[in-house]
Amino acid sequence: MDDLAALARVSAELGSNRLLVQAAGGNTSIKDDGVLWVKASGRWLAKALDEPIFAALDLPRILSALAHNDPACETCDAFVRADLSAPGLRPSVETTLHAGLPQRVVLHVHCVETISHAVLEDGAARVAPLLDGLKWAWVPYTRPGLPLFRTITPGADLYVFANHGLVVAADTLEAAVALVATVGRRLARPLQPAPTRSARGVERAGYRFADAPALAPHAVRFAAAGAYYPDHLVFLGSGAATIDSVVGSPPVILAPGFPPLVRDDLAPTPLAMAGCLADVAARLAPDDRPRYFTAQEEHDLTHWDAEIYRQSLPGSA
């Protein structure tokens, strides 16, 4: 259990850094004597020291089920060790990924610096020279969960998931944390300058400015045009309203020269996602070419039971 306590400390640190994890996003795990301890679906890494967030699963059973294409691997509910897990914890949607990678520790983060490359049409070519010397792999976009795991060939120490985020794997927590930091430094991008403007005509009753970067005009266009990573779509919808195209009371309104306007009653999870949207968009250059989700990819995510479950949890809507 000392290792689990250490994982909790690391998870809380990662979850408290908005440039690495937002709300209930991301997941972490450690393998210990045939047990896979993995963050439960919908739980916040930032709260790892305050409440039980890790589900215990029977690792040999998961690996056997994966080898036999058992449909139970879609949720992994059947492999939960009820004698070790706190009641009500549902395995992470990425449990098969955590189980199938051979390294003892796996950290999956929604690193803003990584996402700012991963959402680009030429993202793989962009990150290749920056990650030179590391054992890494680019993984084309696939719906999270079991389909994503099936696209991975184990053997790398880090994986850049197109339109999604970063996974690192190591045999110790220290090595995994160091690798997250290394990737963040190598992939860091500057914030694009935003014009300074008067808030007159932008401020709206029932809204406030998010604690996030101000956006350049091209960043507003990019962010409004569609969704390009899962949590953006699931918690904010496809794209975002702009100040000159507002209908009703959308959760987020974008205006050039300002951070996102967020509704006063916005729940904690979409509020965090609005900040992440700005953090990513503010790093995109005018000549970048974002790759947005297709209509089918959006449908597959928004109609997936795992995401419907996450949306149903307190603080998500």
Q: Over which residues does each language-model region extend?
A:
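Glycine-rich flexible loops
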Residues: M1-A317
